[in-house]
């Protein structure tokens, strides 16, 4: 009864904002003597089939919880592996581990860790439950950006790795498959398609054999725990790898077509604000690094870690929020336009943090500080049209193609972007690479490789079009055509490859690409 009354008021424009909605819920609960206010997900569950597409969209736009989760064009689903030791031991700041029944480097109280624990670390159940949660709060889950978290995945037993990934695909497919290859094949046409698969690991566990294995799983991105570009800081934190490991892992991954995301830390023992700033300048300017994406993690003091003991004894002092905010702002101010800042700070509940950044909205605080101090971040995420203006109607006539060329990891990179000049917003982008020293057999005869193609804005179901937003308007195809032109005319290449997510392969097939090993290929002759 109450759900239908709310629905009628939304459709008649009597409820226009979240505040209107909350007030109306309270009024109706009092009117009907209800003790509990219904969540938005319950209203969404009971939408009548008689609603038109426009009416449904109007309701979804108001009731969708945390709309930012799908403003980049996809729905993110993160799952965690079961607790296991890291091969090198344990870093000084690192919480978690098998003794606490949590994956290494997690407290067990992060939302993803709690979902994993509640589902007994079963990848199928984690996947199904997370997709159902996202659907229940109004998000499209046709296109899934899938992330495997929880320690050093590439160091796990091979059988566990393959079983885990297969179960993730089975969860997206909602059916049991006989093998990993079968699960991947089913996913090409599934309701929830894996358009990207991310694996988290350490730089010293990202060699050729590790890359070959994750490519076989359908991986499109690797996240490396680089942390810093100073060997003395890595040694002091007990990291167990060197800067050279990060350089090698970056080149091998890029030359295989993978997108590369760095996890970078500030405030580590042995570092300082000046050193932290320099560390970020180096990764953006030194061609041996140049990641496509970064996550910025302030060092946190958590009980049970070696760092906690150092902090208690006065041997270590954490950066305060007053120090962190301008530091991160300065970092953001020089991030290149071809880099996306994926995340700022860990998802750890503040009561678990003894010292360090405790505010959960650090990104928003930094943004406000930058605005007040006349600073701007030009990273991809800050300029994605979905974050700048999610309701903007993007007309192809208002969009301009831009290009940035740079050298990275012994290869040539071209970053193509379609940008809305009036909004100063990115509509879509593509990363094209001419590899330096690829080890993959498919790439031995030359050719360029598209490492990323993405159209941003609110995620739309596959096949659906919308007047507003940027998705499904041919932007991806136009970027791909320009990449093909550059490959043929400027690099004299006879073929172009794409490292596609399993669930995006049909898109490339429609554009003339065929399967070639783990890649999609198009002959340009």
List each language-model region with its residue ranges.
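Flexible, acidic/Gly-rich N-terminal and inter-domain linker regions that tether
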Residues: 1-126, 130-176, 337
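Conserved acyl-donor/pantetheine-binding loop and adjacent beta-alpha core of acyl/acetyltransferases
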Residues: 419-471
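Conserved GNAT acetyl-CoA-binding A-motif
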Residues: 486-500
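Conserved active-site alpha-helix within GNAT-family acetyltransferase domains
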Residues: 500-519
């Amino acid at each position: 009864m109450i759900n239908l009354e709310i629905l009628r008021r939304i459709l008649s424009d009597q409820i226009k904002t979240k505040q209107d909605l909350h007030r109306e819920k309270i009024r109706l609960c009092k009117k009907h003597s209800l003790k509990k206010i219904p969540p938005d997900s319950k209203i969404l569950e009971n939408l009548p089939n008689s609603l038109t597409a426009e009416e449904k969209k109007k309701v979804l736009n108001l009731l969708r919880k945390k709309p930012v989760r799908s403003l980049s064009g996809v729905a993110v689903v993160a799952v965690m592996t079961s607790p296991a030791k890291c091969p090198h031991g344990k870093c000084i700041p690192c919480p978690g581990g098998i003794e606490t029944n949590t994956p290494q480097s997690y407290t067990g109280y992060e939302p993803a860790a709690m979902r994993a624990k509640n589902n007994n670390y079963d990848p199928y159940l984690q996947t199904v439950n997370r997709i159902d949660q996202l659907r229940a709060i109004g998000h499209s889950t046709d296109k899934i950006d899938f992330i495997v978290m929880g320690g050093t995945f590439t160091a796990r037993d091979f059988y566990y790795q393959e079983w885990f990934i297969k179960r993730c695909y089975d969860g997206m497919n909602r059916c049991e498959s006989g093998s990993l290859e079968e699960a991947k094949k089913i996913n090409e046409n599934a309701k929830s398609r894996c358009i990207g698969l991310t694996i988290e690991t350490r730089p010293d566990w990202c060699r050729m054999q590790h890359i070959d294995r994750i490519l076989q799983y359908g991986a499109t991105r690797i996240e490396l725990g680089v942390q810093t570009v100073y060997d003395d800081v890595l040694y002091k934190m007990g990291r167990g790898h060197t800067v050279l490991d990060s350089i090698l892992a970056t080149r091998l991954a890029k030359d295989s077509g993978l997108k590369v995301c760095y996890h970078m830390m500030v405030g580590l023992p042995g570092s300082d604000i000046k050193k932290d700033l320099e560390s970020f300048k180096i990764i953006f300017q030194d061609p041996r690094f140049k990641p496509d994406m970064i996550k910025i993690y302030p060092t946190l003091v958590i009980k049970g870690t070696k760092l906690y003991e150092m902090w208690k004894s006065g041997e270590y002092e954490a950066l305060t929020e007053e120090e962190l905010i301008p530091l991160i702002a300065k970092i953001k101010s020089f991030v290149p336009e071809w880099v996306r800042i994926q995340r700022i700070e860990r998802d750890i509940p503040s009561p678990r943090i003894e010292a360090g950044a405790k505010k959960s909205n650090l990104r928003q605080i930094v943004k406000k500080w930058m605005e007040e101090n006349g600073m701007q971040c030009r990273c991809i995420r800050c300029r994605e049209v979905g974050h700048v203006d999610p309701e903007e109607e993007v007309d192809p006539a208002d969009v301009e193609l831009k290009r940035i060329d740079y050298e990275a990891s012994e290869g040539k990179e071209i970053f193509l972007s379609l940008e809305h000049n009036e909004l100063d917003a990115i509509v879509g982008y593509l990363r094209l690479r001419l590899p330096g020293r690829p080890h993959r057999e498919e790439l031995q005869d030359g050719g360029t490789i598209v490492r990323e193609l993405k159209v941003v804005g609110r995620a739309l179901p596959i096949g659906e079009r919308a007047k507003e937003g940027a998705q499904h308007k041919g932007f991806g195809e136009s970027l791909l055509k320009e990449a093909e032109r550059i490959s043929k005319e400027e690099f004299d290449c006879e073929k172009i490859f794409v490292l596609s997510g399993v669930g995006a392969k049909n898109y490339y097939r429609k554009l003339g690409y065929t399967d070639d090993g783990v890649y999609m290929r198009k002959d340009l002759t």
